[in-house]
Regions:
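Binuclear metal-dependent hydrolase catalytic cores
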Residues: 1-184, 193, 251-278
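Binuclear metal-ion centers of metallo-dependent hydrolases, dominated by the metallo-beta-lactamase
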Residues: 190-278
Length: 278
């Protein structure tokens, strides 16, 4: 659905800079360019026993723009659940946009969220959490909130295992494992107790903000590479890239690492579709 940072790519400030010093943002305005990135999010299309389910991880502030592009393209209509990694705007800023589904497609959407993040939602989306405060007849998202613990749970017959990580000092975020797929979108540190949950991971989708260094809240590519070498997944897709990460140039670098180290790694991109067995 999306593979970019909170502000997305391209940045307005880069496009309006008369010096045009940002090549990635300049490329990102081209139709179909893989440097164009909206808020980090994935959609799991799971063919379980009752039928196919669409499970969304995060609905950030650019979610509706992503849905406009990818839902029609891939024949997606319903949202059967939303799982929240953390309570920043790039993960929950699109909750209000879910009204299009609950008003026109389905009666409600279950939301799975940690208690600490639900407390934030009570402030940022108070009128969705407590619909008694809105005017009668007003159309808002009809959401069913389910509080997650840091232990496995089941959504539409799919087992989901939370992967607790740090997203800045003292700020907890969650990755998730489903089958042998591990998704960690917002991370600055992986606690030791989380590594056993990553054992035998086949596809790792991992945060990699920038090419040169980490920030206080996100892995940069050098640290992300260290983690890949430690976790040893069969394949790695990096996500959460800012405008310093040129899709073609970084992928060329990762291809060279595959030749020298045997590590299968690449930058993901918005709209990437990955068939998996769950």
């Amino acid at each position: 659905m999306g593979t970019g940072t909170s502000e997305g790519i391209p940045r307005v400030s880069c496009l309006t800079n008369p010096l045009k010093t940002c090549p990635v943002c300049s490329k990102a305005v081209e139709p179909g360019n893989k440097n164009r990135r909206l808020n980090t999010s994935i959609l799991i299309r799971y063919a379980g026993a009752p039928g196919s389910s669409n499970i969304l991880i995060d609905a950030g502030k650019f979610f509706y723009h992503s849905a406009l592009q990818w839902f029609p393209a891939f024949g997606i209509r319903t949202i059967d659940a939303v799982i929240i990694t953390h309570s920043h705007a790039d993960a929950i800023g699109g909750l209000d946009d879910l009204r299009d589904w609950t008003n026109n497609v389905q009666p409600s959407i279950p939301i799975y969220v940690a208690q600490r993040d639900f407390e934030v939602m009570k402030k940022t989306h108070y009128y969705i959490v407590d619909t008694s405060v809105i005017s009668p007849g007003a159309a808002v998202s009809e959401l069913q909130f389910n509080i997650m613990q840091e232990e496995p749970f089941v959504v539409h017959d799919l087992k989901i295992t939370p992967l607790p990580v740090w997203h800045g000092r003292g700020y907890r975020s969650l990755g998730f494992r489903f089958g042998n797929i591990c998704y960690i979108s917002d991370v600055s540190e992986i606690p030791e107790e989380t590594y056993p949950l990553l054992k035998d991971c086949e596809i790792l989708i991992l945060d990699a903000l920038r090419p040169d260094r980490s920030s206080s809240t996100h892995f940069g590519l050098p640290r992300a590479l260290e983690e890949v070498r430690k976790i040893q997944p069969k394949r790695t897709l990096f996500t959460g890239m800012m405008h310093l990460m040129d899709h073609e140039k970084v992928n060329d670098y990762l291809m060279k690492l595959k030749e020298t180290e045997g590590l299968d790694m690449q930058l993901s991109y918005d709209g990437l579709r990955v068939p998996v067995m769950l």
